C-alpha cells in the first residue's frame, strides 16, 4: 500500500554553459511516486544527510482529516522505508517544515485542533526510523499562521506567526529553541510585540547556530488595504536574546559601482532606472504606498553577510518588483537596496541561494507587461554588483514557480511551463565566466504539475514536484539526475 511506484517521465533539459551537443536527445528516467496514490498528497519537504533523503508531505485521508507523512529513501532509490504517519490526528495537519542534523530528524507542522491551530514538533534520533511523542510548541499563543524551522546539531530553532492569545486579533512573531535536540524547549519569546500584523516568518542561521537572523512581513492594520513592510531582527548569542526589530524595506539607495545591465535579448537599461531614490518616496500617500511582502533571508557560513530578499509593489500600480538588501556587518546596518528585476511588468515568486558571498536569484516575470510569465535569473556578487538578467524560459507560455539550486559550480533551475501542456523544465548553467550557450535538449509533457523543488546528494541532483493525476489526486514525484 505504501510502496514506491515507478513511472516513465520525460523532462526538458536546457544546458547553458560550456556544454554542447550535436543532436538533441531525450532524457528518460524512472520517477519515484513517494506518496500513496489512494490519497491526495501535497506540500512536500525534503532534507538530505549524506546519501539519505528524508521526505515529508501532507496526505488528505478524508475531507475532514489530513496527516503528515514521512519516508526515507537512499541515494540509489533502491532502499526506502514504509510511509510513516507522523501526526496521526483526527483533524487537519498542514504546512510542514523538515530538517536534520547528524542522526536527528526534526519535523514541525500546523495542526487544526478543536480550540485552535497549533504548532507541533516531533523528532527522530535514529535517522527517521522512529519518531518521538509530539510536542505542542505554541501552547502559550493563539492560532498559528505559518512558521519556519532551522537546526544545527541538537540546537533547533522555531519561529512562527500567531495571535498573542485565542481572543486577540493582531498577529505577532514568536520564537522557541531547544539545545538538547527537542527534549526540552526554552520559554516563548515575542519578537514583534506591536499593534501591527506580523506574518510570513523566515530565518537563517550561521554554520554553528551562534547567529540567528529573522525576517517577516509587518502590515499596518489601520487601513482596509494594509501597507506592508519587511521587518528584521537578529540574535548574536544563539537565540537567547534578540535586537529590537527594524524595517529593512522601502529604503532605496543607489547601486554603487554599477553602470547598468542588459536583458538576455540585449536590451540595455540605464543604471538610474535600476534604483528608486529616497526623495521619490517622501510624498507617497496611503493609496500609493510601497507594499513589501514574501521575504526570505540568507547568511554566509560565518554569519557576517546577511541578505534579505522580498517582493514589492510600487505606488499602488499593481506591478511588483524583486528587491534585495545586504548587510556586511552581522545585520547591524543595511547599506544597499537593489531592484533585481526592474521591469515594467509583474515580478513574482523569487527564490535565491548563496554561493560563498554571491547570491543567485530566480523569479517569474511578465517583463514589459506581457500576458505570460518568463523565468529570470540574476547574480549579485560580493561587491553588490549585479550581473546580467537571463531569461531562462523565453517562450510563449507561462513559466512559473522557479526553484534554484547551486552546487559544484553548477546552477540548476526548475519550473512549471504550460507552453504546450503542463511540464517540468530544468535549466542547467555554469557559474564560471565561460561563454553562454543555450540548446534545447528535449521536449516533454505529461499531466498537470506544480511546485517543483531541487536538492542534491553526493553525486545526484533530485527534482521533486506535485503531480495531479487522472483520479483527481495529487501525488508527490521524485526524479534523479546524475551531476554533471
Label every model-predicted segment.
Residues 1-24, 55, 70:
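Secretory targeting signatures
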Amino acid at each position: 500500500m505504501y510502496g514506491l511506484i515507478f513511472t516513465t517521465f520525460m523532462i526538458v533539459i536546457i544546458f547553458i554553459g560550456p556544454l554542447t551537443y550535436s543532436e538533441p536527445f531525450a532524457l528518460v528516467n524512472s520517477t519515484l511516486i513517494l506518496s500513496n496514490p489512494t490519497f491526495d498528497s501535497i506540500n512536500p519537504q525534503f532534507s538530505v544527510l549524506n546519501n539519505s533523503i528524508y521526505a515529508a508531505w501532507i496526505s488528505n485521508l478524508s475531507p475532514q482529516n489530513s496527516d503528515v507523512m514521512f519516508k526515507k529513501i537512499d541515494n540509489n532509490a533502491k532502499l526506502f522505508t514504509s510511509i510513516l504517519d507522523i501526526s496521526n490526528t483526527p483533524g487537519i495537519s498542514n504546512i510542514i517544515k523538515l530538517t536534520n542534523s547528524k542522526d536527528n530528524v526534526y519535523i514541525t507542522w500546523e495542526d487544526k485542533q478543536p480550540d485552535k491551530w497549533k504548532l507541533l514538533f516531533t523528532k527522530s534520533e535514529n535517522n527517521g526510523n522512529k519518531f518521538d511523542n509530539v510536542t505542542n510548541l505554541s501552547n502559550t499563543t493563539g492560532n498559528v499562521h505559518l512558521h519556519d524551522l532551522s537546526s544545527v546539531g541538537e540546537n533547533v530553532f522555531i519561529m512562527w506567526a500567531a495571535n498573542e492569545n485565542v481572543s486577540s486579533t493582531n498577529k505577532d512573531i514568536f520564537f522557541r529553541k531547544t539545545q538538547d535536540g527537542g527534549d526540552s524547549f526554552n520559554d516563548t519569546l515575542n519578537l514583534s510585540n506591536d499593534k501591527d500584523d506580523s506574518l510570513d516568518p523566515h530565518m537563517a542561521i550561521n554554520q554553528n547556530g551562534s547567529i540567528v537572523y529573522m525576517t517577516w512581513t509587518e502590515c499596518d492594520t489601520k487601513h482596509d488595504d494594509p501597507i506592508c513592510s519587511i521587518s528584521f531582527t537578529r540574535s548574536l548569542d544563539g537565540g537567547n536574546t534578540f535586537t529590537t526589530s527594524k524595517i529593512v524595506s522601502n529604503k532605496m539607495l543607489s547601486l554603487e559601482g554599477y553602470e547598468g545591465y542588459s536583458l538576455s535579448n540585449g536590451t540595455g537599461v540605464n543604471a538610474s532606472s535600476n534604483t528608486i531614490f529616497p526623495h521619490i518616496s517622501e510624498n507617497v500617500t496611503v493609496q500609493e504606498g510601497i507594499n513589501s511582502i514574501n521575504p526570505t533571508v540568507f547568511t554566509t557560513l560565518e554569519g557576517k553577510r546577511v541578505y534579505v530578499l522580498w517582493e514589492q509593489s510600487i505606488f499602488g500600480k499593481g506591478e511588483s518588483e524583486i528587491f534585495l538588501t545586504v548587510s556586511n556587518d552581522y545585520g547591524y546596518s543595511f547599506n544597499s537596496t537593489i531592484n533585481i528585476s526592474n521591469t515594467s511588468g509583474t515580478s513574482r515568486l523569487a527564490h535565491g541561494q548563496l554561493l560563498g558571498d554571491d547570491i543567485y536569484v530566480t523569479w517569474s516575470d511578465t517583463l514589459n507587461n506581457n500576458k505570460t510569465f518568463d523565468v529570470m535569473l540574476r547574480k549579485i556578487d560580493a561587491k553588490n554588483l549585479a550581473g546580467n538578467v537571463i531569461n531562462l524560459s523565453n517562450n510563449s507560455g507561462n513559466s512559473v514557480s522557479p526553484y534554484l539550486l547551486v552546487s559544484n559550480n553548477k546552477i540548476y533551475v526548475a519550473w512549471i511551463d504550460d507552453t504546450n501542456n503542463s511540464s517540468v523544465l530544468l535549466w542547467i548553467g555554469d557559474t564560471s565566466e565561460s561563454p553562454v550557450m543555450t540548446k534545447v535538449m528535449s521536449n516533454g509533457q505529461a499531466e498537470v504539475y506544480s511546485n517543483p523543488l531541487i536538492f542534491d546528494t553526493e553525486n545526484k541532483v533530485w527534482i521533486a514536484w506535485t503531480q495531479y493525476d487522472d483520479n483527481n489526486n495529487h501525488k508527490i514525484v521524485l526524479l534523479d539526475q546524475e551531476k554533471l
